[in-house]
């Protein structure tokens, strides 16, 4: 049996969004095999968040977070399927954590699919021009640009960002762990971030499912 290392547990967690202890337990049962570990989690219903993500979310909470002595604030709407789940400590903690994350990380969109075409094209042009200025071969431009766009999405899309309290997880993966634990679909509907002196603020501007 392969040794169950922290690195192996982390890899399974990144693949499935399951918790550390759940991943370790699955790997022990799977004798250290990553693929089999995924199967174990799916059988337990822990890695099945994707199936729940198509279900309607009509309940939920509005969460707020105020930071820096009232100089920075966030309001976020997170939805779930039932009022029962909305009242649980796990769901309320998730809403608070997402609001806090938005305050710290300042995302502009909820997910990659929300980024407008004009923003995408402008960013691609910038990365292509930068690659050319660095002397990169023209035939490699598309590949280089694609890699840099992935980093760009991580910077501006809430669900792609590393979670501020645990950087080994993205916010999207965090949501999936809660979907698996609570047994209901959960979606981030919208958010707005206010900062004193910033007249525009940050507004997600859409109601978009958090995990698919």
UniProtKB/Swiss-Prot annotation:
Coiled-coil spans in chain: none
Family: Belongs to the EF-Ts family.
Gene Ontology molecular function: any one: translation elongation factor activity
Gene3D superfamilies in the cross-refs: 1.10.286.20, DNA helicase RuvA subunit, C-terminal domain (1.10.8.10), Elongation factor Ts, dimerisation domain (3.30.479.20)
A Pfam family reported for this protein in Swiss-Prot or TrEMBL: EF_TS
InterPro entries to which the protein is assigned, alphabetical: EF-Ts_dimer_sf, Transl_elong_EFTs/EF1B, Transl_elong_EFTs/EF1B_dimer, Transl_elong_Ts_CS, UBA-like_sf
Keywords, alphabetical: Cytoplasm, Elongation factor, Protein biosynthesis
Functional description taken from the UniProt entry: Associates with the EF-Tu.GDP complex and induces the exchange of GDP to GTP. It remains bound to the aminoacyl-tRNA.EF-Tu.GTP complex up to the GTP hydrolysis stage on the ribosome.
Subcellular location: Cytoplasm
Main location: cytoplasm
Protein name: Elongation factor Ts
One GO CC annotation: cytoplasm
Keyword presence, Transmembrane: no
Residue numbers spanned by region Involved in Mg(2+) ion dislocation from EF-Tu: 82-85
Species per Swiss-Prot/TrEMBL record: Solibacter usitatus (strain Ellin6076)
Originating gene: tsf
Domain of life: Bacteria
């Amino acid at each position: 049996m392969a040794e169950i290392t922290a690195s192996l547990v982390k890899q399974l967690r990144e693949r499935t969004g399951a918790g550390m202890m759940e991943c370790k337990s699955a790997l022990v049962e799977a004798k250290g095999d990553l693929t089999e570990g995924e199967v174990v989690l799916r059988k337990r219903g822990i890695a099945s968040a994707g199936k729940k993500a198509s279900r309607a979310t009509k309940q939920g909470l509005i969460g707020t977070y105020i930071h820096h002595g009232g100089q920075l604030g966030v309001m976020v709407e997170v939805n779930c399927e039932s009022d029962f789940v909305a009242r649980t400590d796990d769901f309320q903690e998730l809403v608070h954590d997402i609001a806090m994350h938005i305050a710290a990380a300042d995302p502009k969109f909820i997910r990659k699919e929300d980024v407008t075409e004009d923003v995408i094209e402008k960013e691609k042009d910038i990365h292509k021009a930068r690659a050319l200025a660095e002397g990169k071969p023209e035939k490699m431009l598309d590949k280089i640009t694609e890699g840099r766009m992935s980093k760009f999405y991580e910077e501006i899309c809430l669900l792609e960002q590393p979670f501020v309290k645990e950087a080994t997880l993205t916010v999207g993966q965090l949501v999936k762990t809660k979907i698996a634990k609570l047994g209901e679909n959960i979606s981030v509907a919208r958010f707005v971030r206010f900062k004193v002196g910033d007249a525009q603020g940050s507004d997600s501007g859409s109601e978009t499912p958090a995990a698919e």
